[in-house]
Regions:
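Class I S-adenosyl-L-methionine-dependent methyltransferase catalytic core
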Residues: 1-168
């Protein structure tokens, strides 16, 4: 789910493209599954009615949180869980990014170009996202998935405030 730009036709559910999911391996949990998800991402999937933010998270998580003023709460939960990948806007200057990415994540893949999310029916959206996106990895296993994925962009390994940038 997401609230990500002014070109959404008033819709709040936007689905991660399957090509992104397939390049990142299998996930145990998707805590932000759309009510009409055309394909499931996790072995367990919580939708809006389940309130995935309040549920217990287990295993490897894929998080495409609702975008807006509560995105930080979702990232905080994933940061504390320490096992998963989040897809968010690359808003590197925000408090949320400093608190739960720069100071907590293990790696980042800044995606080349802008993501075209899917509508809940499975069709591509009419527009690309309103900002660049990145994938945030928590845990070494998830860092390996990001690094070895076929997704184009810039991969950055974060460790003790030392950064290694790798062309992808």
């Amino acid at each position: 789910m997401t609230f990500f730009n002014d070109k959404t036709d008033g819709k709040e559910d936007w689905i991660t493209p399957k090509s992104i999911i397939e390049s990142l391996g299998e996930f145990d949990l998707d805590p932000c599954c759309s009510m009409t998800q055309p394909y499931l991402i996790g072995k367990i999937n919580y939708n809006k009615n389940d309130n995935g933010l309040e549920k217990e998270w287990i295993g490897r998580v894929f998080l495409n949180p609702p975008y807006g003023n509560k995105t930080g709460l979702w990232l905080k939960k994933l940061s504390n869980h320490r096992n998963g990948i989040a897809l968010i806007f690359a808003r590197t200057e925000t408090k949320m990014f400093f608190d739960y990415v720069w100071n907590s994540a293990d790696s980042i893949l800044f995606l080349k170009g802008r993501v075209t999310f899917l509508q809940p029916c499975g069709n591509l959206g009419k527009f690309t996202a309103g900002a660049p996106s990145c994938l945030i990895a928590y845990g070494e296993e998830n860092t390996k998935y990001l690094k070895n994925s076929n997704l184009k962009g810039k991969f950055i390994k974060l460790c003790n405030n030392n950064y290694t940038i790798m062309e992808k």
